[in-house]
UniProtKB/Swiss-Prot annotation:
It comes from Glycine max. GO terms for molecular function: heme binding; iron ion binding; oxidoreductase activity, acting on paired donors, with incorporation or reduction of molecular oxygen, NAD(P)H as one donor, and incorporation of one atom of oxygen. Heme binds at residue 451. One of its GO terms (cellular component) is membrane. This is Cytochrome P450 77A3. SUPFAM superfamilies: Cytochrome P450 (SSF48264). Its EC number is 1.14.-.-. Keywords: Heme, Iron, Metal-binding, Monooxygenase, Oxidoreductase.
Length: 513
């Protein structure tokens, strides 16, 4: 059979694209007649609102906020083949995620790249609502993230906090008292999670190498145009090849670590670097409903990667925003330091002390209200067609929740634009971050798909903020600089200008320059 020329290839591809696009458009048009979808900006055939988002020149979350101001609390965006239904109202979110929780508890189909790294949706966050998800989540929550189990890792957290303080001191000595908050906070959290996940003592070089592997995965998972227009996937074969290469490197690097832990628990006392317990220990022989065998090595890699990536950037980002707010609001920083001194005196803050600090809890809750880790919780989908707010929610829709609209809604909060921890002090405003009694803020999602690591993340944030404020007085860099609270998307919502700050040891001690 004769081969096609380059020109023939082009014509064939263009024709296939046109015919497929026409078929898709006609199918979507026939579908749309069946549903009373929420209103939204009119889009183009085939591509929907993709061009409007691109031409706006704004990040997606800013575009969504603009659309919200025009279309209200529930609206639709057509993003190529995806129908996005976006919720921005607390009552609608509560109705969907709490009152109709089981209906909204599943996930939409993933793009092919994500299924590579989730091992075909075999992770807590990616799994569709069903027996696999229930087995994986139950194991993580009951056997790893319960309050009892978390207490067993107190020494790990204490050690990581000591290393964080020393790291900050060393960095300040080398840089005239200036430190890079996010980088240092992120490494401290990652060290904790690595120890919890693998149950092995590791040197910093190995931890940093694991971190590099995890970052490569996150970068590879950045959205692409073919996520919204799968018809274009053939044009992204190079990117898919790169994703497979990153996955291979991830598996090849992590499997030996997994095997080291397996040998350590099979032969107690044989490995002096092994700790008493780890997340891996709960996974080796895990019985997953509907699955005949225990998780494979590749599935273990995906589950461990989820544990590490899911808990690192969200926590570190919260700490960065928290320190920035303390610098911008020195009265809050002073009051927090006074509470710490009053509670522990001269001794080092530990987790039991943190439980006795109501103002610290108010500060952390306020920073999570003002600066949720992401602008959108992980995408939901419905298990069956349903309605919300008088509109149809079809089974193939992506249900998105725009969290800032809820946390900044004046119907929910007094002076929502102000950073004010006092609102949570006794007699002030209340907020249940789990959303069960009502949704006013949702930094970790709500409902059946709420982040399973919520308790762990809040422990880490409280402890880090307490230790960092106890040890140092935090200031702006340069000193006269006004804090810029503009955010940008980098796996989580980070400060657009990464926070550099000055630190001065408490008690009048000077940082050695």
């Amino acid at each position: 059979m004769a081969t096609l020329s380059s020109y023939d290839h082009f014509i064939f591809t263009a024709l296939a694209f046109f015919i497929s696009g026409l078929i898709f458009f006609l199918k979507q048009k026939s579908k749309s007649k069946k549903f009373n979808l929420p209103p939204g900006p009119p889009g183009w055939p085939i591509v929907g609102n993709l061009f409007q988002v691109a031409r706006s020149g704004k990040p997606f979350f800013e575009y969504v906020n603009d659309v919200r101001l025009k279309y209200g609390s529930i609206f639709t965006l057509k993003m190529g083949t995806r129908t996005m239904i976006i919720l921005t109202d607390a009552k609608l979110v509560h109705e969907a995620m709490i009152q109709k929780g089981a209906t909204y508890a599943t996930r939409p189909p993933e793009n092919p790249t994500r299924t590579i790294f989730s091992e075909n949706k075999f992770t807590v966050n990616a799994a569709t609502y069903g027996p696999v998800w229930k087995s994986l989540r139950r194991n993580m929550v009951q056997n790893m993230l319960s309050s009892t189990r978390l207490k067993e890792f107190r020494s790990v957290r204490d050690n990581a906090m000591d290393k964080l303080i020393n790291r900050l001191k060393d960095e300040a000595e080398k840089n005239n008292g200036v430190v890079w908050v996010l980088k240092d906070a992120r490494f401290a959290v990652f060290c904790i999670l690595v120890a919890m996940c693998f149950g092995l003592e590791m040197d910093e070089e190995t931890v940093e190498r694991i971190d590099q592997v995890m970052k490569s995965v996150l970068i590879t998972l950045d959205p692409r145009i073919d996520d919204y227009l799968p018809i274009l996937s053939p044009f992204f074969s190079k990117q898919r090849k790169k994703a497979l290469e990153v996955r291979r490197e991830q598996v090849e690097f992590l499997v030996p670590i997994i095997e080291q832990r397996r040998r350590a628990i099979q032969n107690p006392g044989s490995d002096h670097t092994a700790t008493t317990f780890s997340y891996l220990d709960t996974l080796f022989d895990l019985k997953v409903e509907g699955k005949k065998s225990a998780p494979s090595d590749a599935e273990l890699v995906s589950l461990c990667s989820e544990f590490l990536n899911g808990g690192t950037d969200t926590t570190a980002t919260a700490v960065e925003w928290g320190i920035a707010q303390l610098i911008a609001n020195p009265n809050v920083q002073t009051k927090l330091y006074e509470e710490i001194k009053r509670t522990v005196g001269e001794k080092k803050v530990d987790e039991k002390d943190v439980e006795k600090m109501p103002y610290l809890h108010a500060v952390v809750k306020e920073l999570l209200r003002k600066h949720p880790p992401t602008h959108f919780v992980l995408t939901h989908a419905v298990t069956e067609p349903t309605t919300l707010g008088g509109y149809d929610i079809p089974i193939d829709a992506n249900v998105e929740v725009y969290t800032p609209a809820i946390a900044e809604d004046p119907k929910n909060w007094l002076n929502p634009e102000k950073f004010d921890p006092e609102r949570f002090i006794s007699g002030g405003e209340e907020a249940d971050i789990t959303g069960v009694t009502g949704v006013k803020m949702m930094p970790f999602g709500v409902g059946r798909r709420i982040c399973p690591g919520l308790a762990m993340a809040t422990v880490h944030i409280h402890l880090m903020m307490a230790r960092m404020v106890q040890e140092f007085e935090w200031g702006a860099y340069p000193p006269e600089k006004k804090m810029d609270f503009t955010g940008k998307w980098e796996f989580t919502v980070v400060m657009k200008e990464s926070l550099r700050a000055t630190i001065k040891p408490r008690g009048g001690e000077k940082v050695k320059l």
